[in-house]
From Swiss-Prot:
Gene: rplN
GO molecular function: large ribosomal subunit rRNA binding; structural constituent of ribosome
Keywords noted in UniProt: Ribonucleoprotein, Ribosomal protein, RNA-binding, rRNA-binding
HAMAP family in the record: Ribosomal_uL14 (MF_01367)
InterPro entries cross-referenced by the UniProt entry: Ribosomal_uL14 (IPR000218), Ribosomal_uL14_bac-type (IPR005745), Ribosomal_uL14_CS (IPR019972), Ribosomal_uL14_sf (IPR036853)
A cellular component annotation (GO) from this entry: cytosolic large ribosomal subunit
Family membership noted in the UniProt record: Belongs to the universal ribosomal protein uL14 family.
Known partners and oligomeric status: Part of the 50S ribosomal subunit. Forms a cluster with proteins L3 and L19. In the 70S ribosome, L14 and L19 interact and together make contacts with the 16S rRNA in bridges B5 and B8.
Protein name, UniProt field: Large ribosomal subunit protein uL14
Superkingdom of origin organism: Bacteria
One record GO biological process: translation
Functional description taken from the UniProt entry: Binds to 23S rRNA. Forms part of two intersubunit bridges in the 70S ribosome.
Entry-linked Pfam families: Ribosomal_L14
Taxon lineage: Bacteria, Thermotogati, Thermotogota, Thermotogae, Thermotogales
């Protein structure tokens, strides 16, 4: 359950380290985001000399949440942190590597490039 003002870790090598959510995209007054949702964020921490600077407004897709996700077969999955991957306006990842596992729900939402770069898909 990612909402406005939530801090997210960045799970790629785009140069950002921490993001703060400004808005969850989709629907009218959508309050909460989960795995596969696109969010507009502000970069709160960044690596020096990187493409992304502190204060930049970026789009990201949520790849991990601490709040469990119920799947159609009745199982639940949750992760140790809230994490996102920075994307461009074509929904392609801005980084070239993904760190840590990502949820299988990303495949159903059409983020195949992120799924293929990830070391593990749960």
């Amino acid at each position: 359950m990612i909402q406005q003002e939530t801090y997210l870790n960045v799970a790629d090598n785009s140069g950002a380290k921490k993001l703060r959510v400004i808005r969850v995209i989709g629907g009218f007054h959508k309050k909460y985001g989960t795995v596969g949702d696109i969010v507009v964020c502000s970069v709160r921490e960044a690596i020096p000399n990187s493409d992304v600077k502190k204060g930049d407004v970026v789009r990201a897709v949520i790849v991990r949440t601490k709040k469990e996700i119920r799947r159609n077969d009745g199982t639940y999955i949750r992760f140790d942190d809230n994490a996102a991957v920075l994307i461009d306006k074509f929904n392609a990842p801005r980084g070239t590597r993904i760190f840590g596992p990502v949820a299988r729900e990303l495949r159903e939402k059409g983020f195949m490039k992120i799924v293929s770069l990830a070391p593990e898909v749960w």
